[in-house]
């Protein structure tokens, strides 16, 4: 009979864990919700400062490559044709502007992360990866192109989240290009299913993506996740998965019998001539290979089929002289 106290304890533990996660998310959402959105003019102003900072970092990297060492502050300032204090001031302004753009757009990160929940990554982890993508978007954004930053940042945030899912949520990591292909297949499958009114099959997906059905099946095989044999299952969580799986492997007793049999066969074959030994090995697959016909053996050994038959008969007759019934071994 299940232990009710144990069940209650486990349920409380799970509820406490869920409550902690939910509280952390609530606190985070409340915190970022207090940050005001930027106006279009502010986006342009801060983006220009960030771009100026990125130009400085690029110049520093070029200088380091040329000098084959880390440049001094004076060398860096000379490269930018600025005084040291002006260089430091513009770097500081760039960092502040970058943080303002990131903080003002974290709600966009949360909005995108919600679409990727239940992908084997915690919600807060999705947000963190999306924030890293947002940071990259801030560094790359060119305000002179005229579009809103949120439109540009959306792609970077989404890429950060999807790549993290591809790299971290699987026991066996998939290459990025394969993960992207899987996401494309899933997206097309959803669209086709909505359009057709039933779950789209492999052939329909393949036609939509201009691929062969075999390619789609190969990609879909990669979606399968490995499962730990130590995973606990059941209501009480007191049974391991491996305890319920049939072991098709050889038992220790059977393994010992087989090894003794191999040793006996080796001793038997040692009593034969090299030609007789080779014929029996090939004829009965004693070396772990397939059993060959008389014709196949004759072709391999370069002798006639009749000669192979004679050698086989001689070998078996010789073994019987030693009082050994070879059929019991060869049948095994």
UniProtKB/Swiss-Prot annotation:
The keyword ATP-binding does not apply. It comes from the Bacteria. Keywords: DNA-binding, Plasmid, Sigma factor, Transcription, Transcription regulation. One of its GO terms (molecular function) is sigma factor activity. Residues 294-313 bind DNA. One of its GO terms (biological process) is DNA-templated transcription initiation. A motif (Polymerase core binding) lies at residues 125-138. The keyword DNA-binding applies. Pfam families: Sigma70_r1_2, Sigma70_r2, Sigma70_r3, Sigma70_r4. SUPFAM superfamilies: Sigma2 domain of RNA polymerase sigma factors, Sigma3 and sigma4 domains of RNA polymerase sigma factors. Belongs to the sigma-70 factor family. Sigma factors are initiation factors that promote the attachment of RNA polymerase to specific initiation sites and are then released. This is RNA polymerase sigma-B factor.
């Amino acid at each position: 009979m299940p232990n009710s106290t144990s069940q209650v304890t486990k349920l409380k533990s799970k509820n406490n864990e869920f409550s902690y996660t939910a509280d952390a998310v609530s606190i985070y959402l409340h915190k970022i919700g207090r940050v005001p959105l930027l106006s279009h003019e502010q986006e342009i102003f801060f983006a220009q400062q960030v771009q100026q900072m990125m130009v400085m970092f690029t110049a520093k990297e070029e200088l380091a490559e040329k000098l084959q060492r880390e440049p001094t502050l004076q060398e860096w300032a000379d490269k930018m044709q600025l005084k040291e204090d002006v260089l430091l001031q513009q770097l500081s302004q760039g960092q502040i502007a970058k943080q303002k753009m990131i903080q003002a757009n974290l709600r966009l990160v949360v909005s995108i992360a919600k679409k990727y929940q239940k992908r084997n990554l915690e919600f807060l982890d999705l947000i963190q990866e999306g924030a890293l993508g947002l940071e990259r978007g801030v560094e790359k954004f060119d305000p002179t192109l005229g579009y809103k930053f949120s439109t540009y940042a959306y792609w970077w945030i989404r890429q950060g989240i999807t790549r993290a899912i591809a790299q971290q949520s699987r026991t066996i990591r998939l290459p990025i290009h394969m993960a992207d292909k899987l996401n494309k297949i899933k997206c097309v499958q959803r669209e086709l299913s909505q359009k057709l009114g039933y779950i789209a099959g492999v052939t329909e997906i393949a036609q939509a993506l201009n691929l062969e059905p075999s390619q789609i099946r190969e990609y879909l095989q990669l979606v399968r996740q490995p499962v730990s044999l130590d995973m606990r299952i059941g209501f009480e969580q007191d049974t391991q998965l491996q305890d319920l799986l049939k072991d098709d492997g050889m038992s220790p007793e059977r393994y010992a019998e087989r090894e003794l049999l191999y040793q006996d066969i080796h001793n038997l074959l040692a009593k034969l001539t090299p030609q007789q030994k080779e014929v029996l090995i090939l004829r009965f697959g004693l070396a772990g290979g397939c059993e060959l016909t008389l014709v196949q053996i004759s072709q391999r050994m370069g002798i006639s089929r009749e000669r192979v038959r004679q050698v086989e008969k001689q070998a078996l007759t010789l073994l019987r002289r030693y009082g050994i019934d070879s059929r019991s071994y060869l049948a095994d």
